[in-house]
Amino acid sequence: MSLTQSAKLHIIHQSIGKITTRLYDTSPFHGDSHCKQRRVKDNCIQFNMNISNVLKCYSEIESFSINQRIRRSISLFLSILRSFYSMRMRLLDLFITSSIPVAKILLITGIGFYLALDQVNILNHDARKQLNNIVFYVFSPSLVASSLSETITYESMVKMWFMPLNVLLTFIIGSFLGWIVIKITKPPSHLRGIIVGCCAAGNLGNMPLIIIPAICNEKGSPFGDPESCEKFGLGYIALSMAIGAIYIWTYVYNLMRMLANPAGETAINSTSSTMPLISPKVEVAEQVGTWGKVKQRVCSVAEKINLRTIFAPSTIAALIALAVGLNPLLRKLLVGNTAPLRVIEDSVSLLGDGAIPVLTLIVGGNLLNGLRGSGINKSVIMGVVVVRYLLLPILGVFIVRGAHYLGLVTSEPLYQFVLLLQYVVPPAMNLGTITQLFGSGESECSVILFWSYALASVSLTVWPTFFMWLVA
């Protein structure tokens, strides 16, 4: 039995009301890739049924005398609603989702700041130095080893092959932008290494480890089931953290050391220039050809690079974890609930759990020096902030989306989100460890870290919101 025209109009009226209500009351995702949770899937199905009813009834009442403008307005209204529902996520939900992990970091940092006050004097300079050594030699290597060994396999290595290249690009591009900041601001020589380090090395460890689980477990997350999201997300972060640790202690550490000690290089060059007046052996060296000069240059660079810093504890832990994860026999012995030697892996994992809170407390204590000031130029701080929170994220969007367009990156939203997140994190906390190992620049580094992490609450809310919309 066919419906009357008035009945059809009544169905249209009810359906439009239901659609409008669901725009505010339901999670705005559609399609198989986003409707993974039962509640969201039901809402998507009901929404599509409402749309179908409206369009079907609307197409059958052509003979009904409705003004053409009204019909076009209704059609345009329905198109806008459907487009909004299918292509846009609720920005308020995403804003809240991405701001929660930042609030956690700031809260723990505030506790570290309080413990470092002179009135409390629990986390004083000596205490931070000792804790820093414990993190460097125990906590951080344990965290890298446990996270990487649990998640790394041949299959995951093939799937995530672009991630090491992506992290390397963040370091290289950041170094280049840091060099531009140095040329513009003209800071003292002892600050050059700190500036380049802050622009190059991002916090690929505890920041993403807090951000990803928080986003996965929040209502409105575009990454599907919370358990699967957290499992795969932590796997991506573990590899990112391990690669970042290797780059920091091989590339950034030696780069900061060489940039911070130009006087030592001058002394070496000066000594070599006076050697012909003292040693007759140089006369033979002057006759050496191009190959000899290249060999001398390689030896000179090798002398400047300290192998002990390249093979830092975190680097060694990453190499061991790779060997365990990629070797099926070792993996069966050490990793998993049924592994005979799982007590070793559990103990390492337990030690690694202390890395994030202790590192965050140390940063909070170091920020106290930043508040007291060190006479650092404001343009230097502004340059680092612009590089880390504006230029790098913009370039990261083009790199990751370009790689996806070329087929170098899979279409998985969570994987792309982690790749994008690597461009927007604040400077690495290990930079504070490096400056303390150098014994200089701690105050200036604390100032930069203070303002970087203070503004991270804005950057790590705005950019992840945009990234989630971009990849969803």
UniProtKB/Swiss-Prot annotation:
Origin organism lineage: Eukaryota, Viridiplantae, Streptophyta, Embryophyta, Tracheophyta
Organism: Arabidopsis thaliana
Record key words, sorted: Auxin signaling pathway, Endoplasmic reticulum, Membrane, Transmembrane, Transmembrane helix, Transport
Membrane topology: Multi-pass membrane protein
Residue ranges of the TM segments: 94-114, 134-154, 162-182, 194-214, 232-252, 310-330, 348-368, 380-400, 414-434, 447-467
Localization annotation: Endoplasmic reticulum membrane
Name recorded for this polypeptide: Protein PIN-LIKES 1
Organs and tissues of expression: Expressed in flowers.
GO biological process terms held by the UniProt record: auxin-activated signaling pathway; endoplasmic reticulum to cytosol auxin transport
Lumenal face residues: 1-93, 155-161, 215-231, 331-347, 401-413, 468-472
